[in-house]
Amino acid sequence: MPARAPRRLVQGPRGTWLLGSLWVWVLCGLGMAGSLGTPQPCQAPQQWEGRQVLYQQSSGHNNRALVSYDGLNQRVRVLDERKALIPCKRLFEYILLYKEGVMFQIEQATKQCAKIPLVESWDPLDIPQNSTFEDQYSIGGPQEQILVQEWSDRRTARSYETWIGVYTAKDCYPVQETFIRNYTVVMSTRFFDVQLGIKDPSVFTPPSTCQAAQPEKMSDGCSL
């Protein structure tokens, strides 16, 4: 996702790959101190796999998913997780290939595939260099604490943020990412069980059924 001001959009493919489960907390690390002692944004890992829980105000639901994130090649794979029996709920796999400008949506049960253009540019899951440092604190209790830093796109003390990212201080892993619009949280994503690297790069290769993909996005519901 290209260099830009740290304002992230909550729509289109960006919202989709976070929605596939399922970037609004984010794990990040402690940056080096600046000339005035203020922490600087750290460099988040560019290739990792983990899990996420996405909350969207529009649906009022939490969506869980497995995530493979490849920032080097600008691609993301999201695999819906079933944690409860929800009547008429379809589970999907999402493969977003930003260099090719396309997203594949694959129904897990039937392998039915949809091929949808990506109209937004790549927006990496990281802390933009012009972000504002908000706070540093520990998550958890004694003997189980993890130090994190909180960043936002707030420009002055009198302005309000539209994006907040939380990253671990040690290795800059994403913990949470939050988007706000009109003083209301519209999307929030938590990241956990993060492991560095991509175990199987083939997860970014669409199945053969996508050779005859339909052009419209599939609904996650079903007809009764």
Swiss-Prot record:
Subcellular location: Lysosome lumen; Secreted
Signal peptide: 1-37
Short name of one Pfam family: Ependymin
GO annotation terms (biological process): cell-matrix adhesion; myofibroblast contraction
Main subcellular location: other
Keyword match Disulfide bond: yes
Disulfide bonds: 42-172, 88-222, 113-210
Keyword annotations of the record: Disulfide bond, Glycoprotein, Lipid-binding, Lysosome, Secreted, Signal
Gene Ontology CC: extracellular region; lysosomal lumen; lysosome
Expressing tissues: Detected in brain, small intestine and in soleus, extensor digitorum longus and white gastrocnemius (at protein level). Detected in brain and skeletal muscle, and at lower leavels in heart.
Function text: Binds anionic lipids and gangliosides at acidic pH.
Protein name: Mammalian ependymin-related protein 1
Species of provenance: Mus musculus (Mouse)
